[in-house]
């Protein structure tokens, strides 16, 4: 691995340690399984359907979103820097008979090899785990074809997000392992939009993602105080 790679080895180690439980619907990754249908439908709707489209999933982990997009007929490539999560992703896809590709590399490395190749690029809950999120946005702008869509989800940085994602989710409700998140690495919507625009992408839409404890489900909403998703487009010209 390039020593200059945009990778935090401590962050990688967190997910390596629990990768074997990635597809355990009641384990540490239960929130990802619960939130996936909401994300998948949003991405599908905004993309005008996924069938036949070339999609790159950056920071794919164990393949929850990657595999679900492939099931909808997309040609999916998932990339991640975690060896163990990718091993889990490959095995699960093989067991389920789902065709897609997984590669161990950074977005920047992939961009140097395959520019302008993807109709859709997704990057879910990954930017808050890398040292230089703006570098990832620049790589994404290179990877997506002109006119293509980009979907990014991350966590806002404010006291409410700290209370809900760290105190609440990690310590009180124990929805995710302690130490999963670092509040300093959270990204405000304004910061994310600026990064995207600096990379040459245009903001198309934004939505909050909210957990409803009574129904134990996630839903979309206008409030972007905590979890949120942004849709970008790469302009056809310029």
Curated annotation (Swiss-Prot):
Pathway(s) where this gene product acts: Cofactor biosynthesis; ubiquinone biosynthesis
Enzymatic reactions: a 3-demethylubiquinol + S-adenosyl-L-methionine = a ubiquinol + S-adenosyl-L-homocysteine + H(+); a 3-(all-trans-polyprenyl)benzene-1,2-diol + S-adenosyl-L-methionine = a 2-methoxy-6-(all-trans-polyprenyl)phenol + S-adenosyl-L-homocysteine + H(+)
Listed EC numbers: 2.1.1.222, 2.1.1.64
Protein task: O-methyltransferase that catalyzes the 2 O-methylation steps in the ubiquinone biosynthetic pathway.
A single BP term in Gene Ontology: methylation
SUPFAM superfamilies named in the record: S-adenosyl-L-methionine-dependent methyltransferases (SSF53335)
Name of the molecule in the record: Ubiquinone biosynthesis O-methyltransferase
Record organism: Aeromonas salmonicida (strain A449)
PANTHER family: METHYLTRANSFERASE, UBIQUINONE BIOSYNTHESIS O-METHYLTRANSFERASE, MITOCHONDRIAL
Name of the coding gene: ubiG
Keywords of the record: Methyltransferase, S-adenosyl-L-methionine, Transferase, Ubiquinone biosynthesis
Binding site for S-adenosyl-L-methionine: 39, 59, 80, 124
UniProt enzyme class: transferase
Gene Ontology terms, MF aspect: 2-polyprenyl-6-hydroxyphenol methylase activity; 3-demethylubiquinol 3-O-methyltransferase activity; polyprenyldihydroxybenzoate methyltransferase activity
Pfam families tied to this protein: Methyltransf_23
Family indicated by similarity: Belongs to the methyltransferase superfamily. UbiG/COQ3 family.
């Amino acid at each position: 691995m390039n020593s200059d790679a945009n990778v935090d080895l401590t962050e990688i180690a967190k997910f390596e340690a629990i990768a074997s439980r990635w597809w355990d619907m009641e384990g540490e990754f239960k929130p990802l399984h619960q939130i996936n249908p909401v994300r998948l439908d949003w991405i599908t709707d905004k993309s005008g359907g996924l069938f036949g489209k070339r999609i790159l999933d950056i920071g794919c982990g164990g393949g929850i979103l990657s595999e679900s997009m492939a099931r909808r007929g997309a040609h999916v490539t998932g990339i991640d820097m975690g060896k163990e999560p990718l091993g889990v992703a490959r095995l699960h896809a093989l067991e389920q008979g789902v065709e897609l590709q997984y590669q161990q590399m950074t977005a920047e490395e992939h961009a140097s090899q395959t520019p302008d190749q993807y109709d859709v690029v997704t990057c879910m809950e990954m930017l808050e785990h890398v040292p230089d999120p703006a570098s990832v946005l620049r790589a994404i702008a290179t990877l997506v074809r002109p006119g293509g869509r980009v979907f990014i989800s991350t966590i806002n940085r404010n006291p409410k997000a700290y209370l809900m994602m760290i105190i609440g989710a990690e310590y009180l409700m124990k929805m995710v392992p302690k130490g999963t998140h670092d509040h300093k690495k959270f990204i405000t919507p304004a910061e994310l939009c600026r990064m995207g625009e600096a990379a040459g992408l245009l903001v198309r839409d934004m939505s909050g993602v909210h957990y409803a404890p009574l129904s134990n489900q996630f839903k979309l909403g206008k409030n972007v105080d905590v979890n949120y998703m942004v849709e970008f487009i790469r302009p056809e010209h310029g």
